[in-house]
A protein has these predicted regions:
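Elongated scaffolding segments in large macromolecular assemblies
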Residues: 52-54, 62-82, 246-254, 258-260, ...
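N-terminal auxiliary "cap/dimerization" subdomain that precedes the catalytic jelly-roll/cupin core
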Residues: 1, 5-128, 320-343
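A short secondary-structure junction signal
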Residues: 151-156, 171-172, 185-193, 199-204, ...
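Short secondary-structure capping micro-motifs at structural edges
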Residues: 160-164, 239-243, 262
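Short, solvent-exposed loop/turn segments at secondary-structure junctions
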Residues: 66, 146-148, 181-183, 195, ...
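Conserved double-stranded beta-helix
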Residues: 122-189
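Double-stranded beta-helix
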Residues: 185-256
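Non-heme Fe(II)/2-oxoglutarate
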Residues: 259-343
Length: 343
């Protein structure tokens, strides 16, 4: 059975199970007169898939060989780091300060490990990406603890946001998958009404280069509360209706960086571990294709972070320069894969 889709409005929840012999299946969720398309195990090629993603569609795929291996590798690291404790129950066993210490060592180890990059390379090939033109940033290992334990700093629980508020290009595609089984109450939520509706926000105060220089390195210092300045909605965001996709371990969900989404408050009693990474396609970078800019005003660019799928080299300098905005003098080269927001 393919992933469950939950569309919530007020106190009413409807769940749709989409299968049909694991073939491509399109489910349209209606909000007013608007549609959000969900593709399950789609046979679209990468060009067609990116076009749909830039229109706000979401793609979900069953677990693939490389994706399962990446999740297995992540579990090996997680379980070794937290041994002898159950990683999904560490909130019941460890002081939060000790947990933060472990994560501060664990997460970079996963992010920068050569095996992580190699398995991402395999995932991209399995999903029909042209490795000579598809660039990715290194995968992040995310944690979402029960909200009364740790939800700041290195385990930040994200408020409703678009990744484009954080200087991501509009051609960026986000890939997300769970490492252990998840439930609707410890994943992430999309807020589909805002795909075309602007949200007054403070993204104009965010510069990616400044973030890397001043705020990125000290995430583990923010244990009780996170005081780092991040772009936020400056008006109340209607949380409902919202969409949650409950994927299988190694099942990948793809969506545009322009989607408004948030971390679901973890009320299921177990810690969620997930992996995410981002891709851009060279043709779209050159042509400045992508999702529409509804309300993003951040400066700087994350274009320096992406690695080519075929050989792990960076984007060409002249392609990156297309995204300069006058703040590039503040750019300080850093290890590829500086952490950026996601669940």
């Amino acid at each position: 059975m393919l992933p469950a889709v939950t569309l919530r409005r007020s106190t009413v929840a409807k769940r749709y199970y989409c299968h049909r012999n694991r073939c491509a299946y399109l489910c349209k969720l209606v909000e007013g007169e608007r549609f959000m398309n969900l593709f399950f195990d789609s046979k679209l090629d990468d060009d067609g898939r990116r076009e749909e993603l830039y229109r706000g569609s979401i793609f979900v795929y069953s677990p693939s060989s490389s994706a399962l291996k990446l999740c297995e590798f992540a579990r090996e690291l997680v379980e070794a780091a937290f041994a002898p404790n159950d990683p999904q129950k560490v909130q019941d066993r460890l002081p939060v300060e000790r947990c933060v210490e472990i994560l501060a060592d664990l997460k970079p180890k996963f992010i920068h490990h050569s095996k992580s990059k190699e398995l991402i390379q395999g995932m991209l090939a399995e999903r029909g990406c042209d490795l000579s033109k598809t660039y990715f940033d290194v995968p992040r290992l995310r944690t979402a603890f029960p909200s009364d334990y740790l939800s700041s700093g290195i385990a930040y629980a994200f408020h409703p946001h678009r990744d484009t508020w954080y200087s991501a290009p509009f051609s960026q595609i986000n890939w997300w998958m769970p490492v252990y089984d998840v439930c609707p109450d410890n994943i992430m939520a999309f807020h589909p009404r805002y795909w075309k509706d602007a949200v007054v926000n403070s993204s104009n105060t965010y510069n990616y280069y400044q973030w890397n220089r001043m705020s990125r390195q000290n995430a583990s210092q923010h244990v009780k509360a996170d005081t780092r300045v991040q772009p936020r909605a400056q008006v109340s965001v209607e949380q409902e209706p919202h969409l949650r996709v409950v994927a299988s371990v190694g099942g990948a969900m793809l969506f545009s960086a322009a989607h408004l989404h948030s971390t679901v408050q973890n009320t299921c009693g177990v810690t969620r571990y997930s992996i995410d990474f981002r891709t851009v396609h060279l043709d779209d970078v050159w042509n400045r294709c992508g999702a529409p800019n509804i309300d993003s005003a951040s400066t700087g660019t994350t274009m320096h972070d992406y690695l080519r799928g075929s050989d792990f080299t960076h984007l060409p300098d002249d392609a990156i320069s297309l995204y300069f905005d006058g703040t590039e003098a503040e750019f300080i080269p850093s290890p590829s894969g500086a952490p950026r927001p996601s669940r």
